[in-house]
């Protein structure tokens, strides 16, 4: 058994990974419903750059004013360790910006853009508009 297998093996290893993925998808579903109720229109979900070392954007939407909104969805069962928002560090933001720039290559004249975060914690959904910038 290799090192990677040892890290995921054990009680509930595979089941935990599936449960975590399902919880993440459920949080994205809740975030999307919240944003659509606010008038945003979905353009892409789980957009990934090709190759290794790229980035992923959970949701890409268009706001009513035409702004392209790149959304990172974070979910935590509790507010321990800073809650959901604390998990969007500098490296994660760089990967999101990298993926956004890749996505924008398809636009002949890119619209204004914004980077939002939606934090899902328990029953609460918190939408942080302009949570960070591309700089």
Curated annotation (Swiss-Prot):
Transmembrane segments: none annotated. It comes from the Bacteria. Gene3D superfamilies: 3.40.1350.10. Residues 1-21 are annotated as: Disordered. Coiled coil: none annotated. It comes from Paracidovorax citrulli (strain AAC00-1). This is UPF0102 protein Aave_0630. The lineage of its organism: Bacteria, Pseudomonadati, Pseudomonadota, Betaproteobacteria, Burkholderiales. GO terms for molecular function: nucleic acid binding. Belongs to the UPF0102 family.
């Amino acid at each position: 058994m290799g090192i990677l297998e040892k890290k995921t093996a054990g009680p509930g290893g595979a089941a935990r990974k599936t449960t975590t993925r399902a919880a993440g998808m459920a949080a994205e579903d809740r975030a999307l419903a919240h944003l659509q109720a606010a008038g945003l229109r979905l353009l892409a979900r789980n957009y990934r750059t090709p190759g290794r070392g790229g980035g992923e954007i959970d949701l890409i939407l268009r706001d009513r004013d035409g702004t392209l909104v790149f959304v990172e969805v974070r979910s935590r069962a509790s507010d321990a360790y800073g809650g959901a928002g604390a998990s969007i560090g500098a490296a994660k933001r760089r990967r999101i910006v990298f993926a956004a720039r890749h996505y924008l290559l398809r636009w002949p004249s890119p619209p204004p853009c914004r980077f939002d975060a939606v934090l899902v914690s328990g029953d609460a959904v918190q939408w942080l508009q302009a949570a960070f910038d591309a700089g």
